[in-house]
């Protein structure tokens, strides 16, 4: 199942080496992927992510965080980047409204990346899902206030959603097999030799990079392939 890759202690993993973590960064719940589920999570199994790994995260944080230790100062460049995004969207004065772009995104995902998928529909979806993203170049946010600005909130949410939609569409297109909730009519069987792996995706605007990381098939703390 999808999510931020973590180890069994809820620490976020990187690609640089076996089980190498990002210091100080943790993820739990449905935002995380600990590799304990199959390709289609069973009902109520989200409790594992919340209760089991929530407890594991708390225990690990208690081990790592020393009382009185100050937070590292956030670089000014990172703060400026967040503020630039906020101000750019709040002051957008184009012709496309967020609701129309969001509806276009929803229709594309429902028609091209639904339950049953094919090479043709996914390839069409890969192209179509980028149109709502490109529409943000001429976006309009009419409410410029800083108090209870639902127009801005919906726009910030859409900015996140459209990137996730692009990532999902591209990942589905490149996975040429059927597994769990991912059903390809043109590839009806699993391909364990090639795709017994989690999909990794980097999204930079409308461009994505796809890679893979092996699933954990044994009881932790069995590491992933050390050659990654």
In which residue ranges do the predicted regions lie?
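Short loop/turn microsegments at loop-to-beta-strand junctions
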Residues: 1-2
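Single conserved hydrophobic/aromatic residue that forms the stacking wall/gate
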Residues: 218-228
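Glycine- and aromatic-enriched mobile tails/lids
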Residues: 5-27, 31-220
